[in-house]
């Protein structure tokens, strides 16, 4: 990751279970306090750096046209479906905490922030802040980590950064008709007026299983 690009990820949950990781240049570090991360990201944006913010929770859901499609997993999720009990819990925390972080960034930033979900536009410099989804499955979790929530955020951020280094970040889930909750938060806090992204999926990054 270059000095002008910041990759961060948040493992959402109850306040005592939040963890985050942030990478910029050769520096990286994490923590448990969301407000600390907000302060760092505001400083990054004010310094002209781009921020790619990953949320370890479902940030969009399918938008089926028939009842037979309701409550179905997204293609590629496997046993980590958004509609399973753990997925719906993470979705709820993710919606609230994504909105909290984006609203705090918008409120404290010294300039307007161009937010969105289009990773190609972000890499081309058209966005200041990108929201992406982290899908950390059981095999990618470090069970021996002293801070497992920070460790989950770290493995997600590192995988996104690895893909950025190749110049292309592809999603590990298939697309389709969706309702994007992260996009709703981006619009709600004034980072964009582009309503078409409400119907578009974010890029989803699934770190590989640990060796």
Residue positions per predicted region:
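RNase H-like (RuvC/DEDD) metal-dependent nuclease/polynucleotide-processing core
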Residues: 1-211
